[in-house]
């Protein structure tokens, strides 16, 4: 395959999956000598997507827009990005994301299901494919396209570098509460069903508080996190930072 100048990475999963794509993106950027790399992600993961280095454009898919008008969103993506990329890489095996990979890239790579009843047509039309392995860490799954492209890599995660401004902001906040060493406790998730129950969370926080180590509770300003913020118990070693820090400041 000729060296691609424009690449799009498709990740229709959660924040963690987007975050753990940075090693793949870093390897592609270095091996192909600074190509344009764009992302297509779910709109609720765009905050983490913006922190990944070497990304030029970020396009989003919205499940809300899908409910409002089933086909308009797909039509808009198709019209604006059809065969715009030399290479598309899709990190999930869903029908929609594979369709995007086929439509957006002249050459396409995608994860597919082990079940041939679901993946047979994908294997016919994709340039390359690999089987998504649920028993492997998501980072290792995300690096599989590099094997197909014969790009050497290490099984390590390339951390996201926070800006100097974000670093100074969080140092200022820690100085204000006279905290140097601490434990980060992040009680939230993107979806309610993934959140640790309130009663068990409070028991865990009470146990952590008894250790005498400062505990920073982190979270965003969204509806789920704002509800949790009100439920966090007050204790001498607990600092409720929910809604007071940016995602970048976590790094």
Report residues per predicted region.
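Catalytic machinery of carbohydrate-active enzymes
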Residues: 1-251
């Amino acid at each position: 395959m000729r060296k691609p100048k424009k690449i799009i990475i498709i990740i229709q999963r959660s924040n963690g999956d987007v975050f753990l794509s940075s090693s793949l993106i870093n390897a592609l950027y270095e091996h192909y000598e600074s190509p344009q790399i764009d992302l297509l992600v779910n709109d609720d993961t765009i905050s983490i997507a913006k922190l990944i280095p070497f990304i030029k454009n970020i396009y989003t898919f919205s499940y809300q827009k899908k409910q409002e008008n089933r086909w308009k969103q797909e039509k808009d993506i198709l019209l604006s990005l059809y065969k715009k990329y030399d290479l598309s890489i899709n990190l999930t095996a869903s029908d929609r994301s594979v369709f995007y990979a086929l439509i957006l890239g002249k050459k396409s790579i995608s994860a597919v299901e082990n079940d041939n009843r679901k993946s047979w047509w994908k294997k016919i039309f994709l340039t390359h494919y690999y089987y998504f392995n649920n028993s492997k860490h998501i980072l290792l799954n995300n690096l599989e396209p590099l094997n197909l492209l014969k790009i050497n890599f290490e099984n390590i995660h390339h951390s996201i570098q926070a800006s100097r401004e974000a670093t100074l902001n969080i140092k200022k906040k820690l100085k204000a509460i006279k905290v140097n060493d601490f434990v980060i406790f992040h009680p939230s998730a993107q979806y309610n069903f993934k959140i640790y129950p309130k009663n068990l969370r409070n028991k865990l926080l009470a146990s952590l508080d008894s250790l005498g180590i400062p505990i920073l509770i982190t979270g965003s300003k969204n509806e789920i996190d704002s509800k949790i913020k009100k439920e966090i118990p007050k204790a001498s070693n607990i600092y409720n930072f929910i809604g007071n820090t940016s995602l970048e400041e976590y790094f």
